[in-house]
Amino acid sequence: MLVTAPALTYAQTPDEEGTDSLARKESPEVQVAFRKMAQKDLLGGVSVVNVEELTKKNYNTYSLDNMQGYIGGWNGNSLWGMDGDHAGYLVLVDGVPREANNVMPSEIAQITFLKGAQAVVLYGSRAAKGAILISTKRGHAGGLRVSLRANTGFNVAKAFPEYLGSAEYMTLYNEALLNDDPSAKPLYSAEQIYNHGSGINPYRYPNINYYSSDYVKKACNRSEATAEISGGGQRARFYSNVSYYRTGDLLNFGEAKDNMIDRFNVRGNVDVDINRFISTHINANATFYNAQNAKGDYWNAAATARPNFPQNASPLIPVDLIDPNATSALELLSTTSNIIDGKYFLSGSQANPTNVFADNYAAGSIKWTSRQFQFDAGLDINLDKVLKGLSFNALFAVDYATSYTTSFDNKYAIFVPTWANYNGKDVIVALSKEGNDEKPGTQNISGSSDKQTIAFSGQFNYRNTFGGVHNVSGMLIANGYQQTISQQYHRISNANLALQLGYNYRQRYYADFDAALVHSAKLAEGHRNALSPSLTLGWRLSEEGFLKDSPVIDDLMFSVSGSILNQDIDLVVGDNEFYLYKSVWTQNDGYAWYDGPAGKYTISTRGENDGLSFIQRKEFSANLRASLWQKLITVDASFFINSMEGYLIDQPTFYPSHLNTGYPDASFMAVQNFNNNRRIGFDFSINANKRFGEVDLSLGVSGTYYDTKITKRDEIYDNAYRYRQGKPIDGIWGLQSDGLFRNEEEIAASPEQKLGSTVRPGDIKYVDQNGDNVIDDKDEIYLGKGGWYGSPFTLGINLTAKWKDFTFFALGTGGFGGYGIKNSSYYWVDGDDKYSAIVRGRWTEATAETATYPRLSAKSASNNFRTSDYWLYKTDRFDLAKVQITYDLPQSILHNTFIRNLSAYVSGANLLTFSKERKHMEMNVGSAPQTRFYNIGVKAVF
């Protein structure tokens, strides 16, 4: 069952040797910043998912897969809508900054989402936009336990883009030429169009469908095997995980048949009690990852290569189409070793000497390799002999990651045919050769990169109870890490001292003060340290006399928090992060005399500002948690409002203009803290649990809503409607359309559209916002929220039903309130672009009243293809993200065997999308298609 305790989501299913129950632990421990806490003592801004239990009924392949379906505050992209500019939320795996995609769900015990500023303040600057704590599994005292899991399934393509065939494309391209110039001659004759459309000779008159089953499969396999071994005694315990998966590819020709991704991983976690006072743990993980692909970007070619190209020559032509009497052609063909399947040669044209099909067959292959080694060790010392409740913890970690690319880089020849028709049959009478076959047989290495992470933390902890009612806690922490990345001079660093002081009376009244002294090398001396304080107050109303004996309320907790976090992760201007407070002088410009001597002059390109300071996250939040009717319903809801203040500007408009000149390109303006952004919103998680006869049901609903606003922005515009201040941070700005021009008279009577291309009937007409009788960038207005940091409202629904030994699980997620622009090459078609099916709704004189697409143009159509509400669409959607049915073999069958537990399951992921724009949302352009995943798995515990 899925049960959410206050601020806590736990997925509960039958344990491996017991029976299912709606009951849960009274107060499970939750990993938060630098400590574990009983869930009942959490003060808001924290949500957690018990992944170990969830995996028993929901098999996943990614650690953060659809977590928005279980908790509030996480929308799949961000925590509380915080941006990911320069750096987003911090991910810590076992307390060390690591990537979420390098730990598999089978390795994870628990994931904690730290949303509120009060929850992340102890981590310092790098966690200013939230943190996700991933805790891996640990061993437990007891006998040896072995768990084996095997999965196999198929990724099935959801949809492919639809493009016009050769004949239709050629017809419409001729139309585009006439649209641009009514006196233009057609590029393609009626005979050529007929030949390409009839299929009379697809090798001479190509009509290439890149999504044909000749090249693309409907599905590809993914298989995975995992072994988990754990056990130990009172003194030492261990957990190990060995896993391997391999994923195929949808392409099914040439070298691409062998496209694959595979990953092998070994993890070992050991806990040792050295004595009654000292314990330690060691975690190690090694990952080997490979991605092999054929040369050539097939999916990009599928979105850009026209169906009739190369002209007069299909990329692959049968050898037997060569006239037997054309001996010179046959002799020339004998110089190549690239005869595909013994019967096709590589073809093209002088203008197209390469193509993606030939690349896949003859250009070689490329393999990206990644190796990661992660190690961390911790020490825990009980100092009760010094002071009751005192302890010390330390953690040290070293991670290495390296990656490189190996490739076989071959070159190939293509043969350009000369066609003739003998007795009604097309034959090749001559060939010309472009390029040469070159297979050096050497493996090339490129793109080598590496990354090292070193992390350390040490802390004194104090926890004690006085008089049985006064509970006191405290932590004094020194924490820091550095990441060294190849080809980057400056390391990514985070260093801070932190203090936590907590008190509660009878677990009824709570007060918690947290503070961090953060440090940044990005700022000038004297400004590199700042204090980040946070205060949280909590009140458990259910312990008050007026609610203590309530038959409805089991637990009711309310808390409020105020925080100011100082961060340096957004201290960025362009590509520069360091020494932004310093002035910059250059001698790059000058002049030269005709007789040779040259002079350089020294100019300032940036002024100095030693007062440059941290960006601040100022936040107020409130949290309400409740358990009702003996845990029949649990509720966790939060409200938040925060302001990110002091974003940098480098060309302040409030400086006199003479401090910045265009020629020479000089400036005395200094970088300043100025811009502010605000976010306000709420999140919730509601769960209901009920048993109906032999059926246990659990229903969970979670959601996150946030609204953004630019509260301060350095900007100057002539018109009020252009100001970004007061509008959403993720606002989409563009022109307001007013249909399509019907004729030249309407164009002449309308404002002049200075948008880079000649306006003709069938082009998009725009509204002149400022009344200057000109359409340009000054007429752009706010169009809607882009949802860049996740949809404004995110919804999650999960349902679990258990009957006897069957468990049914379903998960749905939704995103609402955002807008997008249809601006891919599928929609914005001009010049020599490939024509998609969308152009069938184009404007013509005959369809002027019903057209859904602007006129076609063989030139640039920048007037039409720019951000405007003509291309705007709502991104509202609801997805059936997962369905799984699990069967657990009854213990009555297994009790006399060496198998403790045996279960089998079938599942489907990414099954359905409900949206007005479903076809658009399920279609990828220029990349591999989206897929549904159908899986079957089995798990055995020994």
Indicate where each model-derived feature is located.
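Outer-membrane beta-barrel proteins
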Residues: 96-139, 159-163, 206-226, 245-283, ...
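Conserved small-residue
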Residues: 147-203, 296-304, 572-575, 663, ...
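Short, small/polar-rich motifs associated with maturation and membrane association
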Residues: 1-267, 279-281, 926
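Extracellular/periplasmic, surface-exposed regions of secreted and cell-surface proteins
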Residues: 269-278, 284-288, 320-324, 328-409, ...
